[in-house]
């Protein structure tokens, strides 16, 4: 490792799906490293075995791969400072915890669950009372010899002030009297999240630590550990919370969207990454659409805001729509096919011109889940009201629409080459024959084919999508509906 190399780490716990907040941490961590041509490390923090979810590590790997956040070191790719799974480093933490005990910066705590529970019952906000802080060396050795269960706690000063620097929130000072003697090693011998973080960040040469601002209150305790060991303190980048609305945080516990949920809701992964990048970071320009490569180039963590960010679904939809428009037709069609399969039978998939349908749908949706409802008219002609034949701008009404359809039917029946160009010629010939404006013919034909007031595509496109047989059937239905209503 180069002395000046920027090294960042994403250190998730394998507890389920990748929440939006976690993904933002991963993204910012990646961008900080890559902006400086540094290394992005993946570390799995599985010391809380009670929260471990089977398969969650694979979700982490898959999400990083899908989003393009490729890690340079990690459990699956190796590296010079492994292992990269905390449970595989168990012996390392105990060694460092004992060093702190020897330095008077930590102590063995033998308080049992019953005593700790009674403290919690008698206090609104639980804080360990330091009962074991000053046990004599002999008392400690006797308890250890007798196999009394213990944890190792950090020994924080009871007075004075601890000050630290954060790149987003500036200089922060905390009274030491507010610092709890947090547990470093649990009774099962595994480290706590807080202690393992500090030890691993040092041993792995981490230069920048990105996390949520809920960890600001823990930073003084982390710094006291760094100072106790004589280690360099990394650069802290504490990010503001992501809010569901003005009053509520986006929360995994409340069932708010995970990365997987957003994909299932019809969002493109590239759009999600772009959107999440802007949840707290301001590029300093009006640009809103960024590729990952552009983000690497432009990202400066000093432009992260202090104030919370609102997860604006309307904006995410808009952004996703912009990404959808940029897809090639073949790419879009590939994404659209599973949604067509939701409503069309195998036979219908082969009958209708779905590639043509995709061409019409692509510019009309913001998320892919809008497709089934938008194209439902293709599967089944809606039982529509003839009022939709009336259009002020097109100068149509039920009477002249009936004239148009009755003229159009034989012309369409006679058409052998059912292609866009041929359909175009027939319909335009009809316009000339009737000596009317285009809309007087286009609107009734489009309405008869779709059965809706608005549709993806006009008369020619819909006829091409539906095919000759179904198009003629729908024109006949339109004629019957209009005749019945007028007469």
Swiss-Prot record:
Enzyme class of the recorded protein, top EC level: ligase
Entry keyword annotation includes Glycoprotein: no
Binding residues annotated for ATP, in chain numbering: 252
Gene3D superfamilies: 1.10.10.350, HUPs
Keyword entries, A-Z: Aminoacyl-tRNA synthetase, ATP-binding, Cytoplasm, Ligase, Nucleotide-binding, Protein biosynthesis
One biological process term in Gene Ontology: glutamyl-tRNA aminoacylation
Catalysed reaction, written as an equation: tRNA(Glu) + L-glutamate + ATP = L-glutamyl-tRNA(Glu) + AMP + diphosphate
Record's GO cellular component terms: cytosol
Superkingdom in the source lineage: Bacteria
Signal peptide: none
SUPFAM superfamilies in UniProt: An anticodon-binding domain of class I aminoacyl-tRNA synthetases, Nucleotidylyl transferase
Motif ('HIGH' region): 12-22
Coiled-coil region: none
Enzyme Commission numbers on file: 6.1.1.17
Keyword Cell membrane: no
GO molecular function, one term: tRNA binding
Motif residue range(s): 'KMSKS' region: 249-253
Cross-referenced Pfam families: Anticodon_2, tRNA-synt_1c
Subcellular location(s) of the protein: Cytoplasm
InterPro entries registered for this protein in UniProt: aa-tRNA-synth_I_cd-bd, aa-tRNA-synth_I_codon-bd_sub2, aa-tRNA-synth_I_CS, aa_tRNA-synth_I_cd-bd_sf, Glu-tRNA-ligase_bac/mito, Glu/Gln-tRNA-synth, Glu/Gln-tRNA-synth_Ib_cat-dom, GluQ/Sye
Subunit comment: Monomer.
Described purpose of this protein according to its UniProt entry: Catalyzes the attachment of glutamate to tRNA(Glu) in a two-step reaction: glutamate is first activated by ATP to form Glu-AMP and then transferred to the acceptor end of tRNA(Glu).
Family per similarity comment: Belongs to the class-I aminoacyl-tRNA synthetase family. Glutamate--tRNA ligase type 1 subfamily.
HAMAP family per UniProt: Glu_tRNA_synth_type1
Protein name: Glutamate--tRNA ligase
This protein's encoding gene: gltX
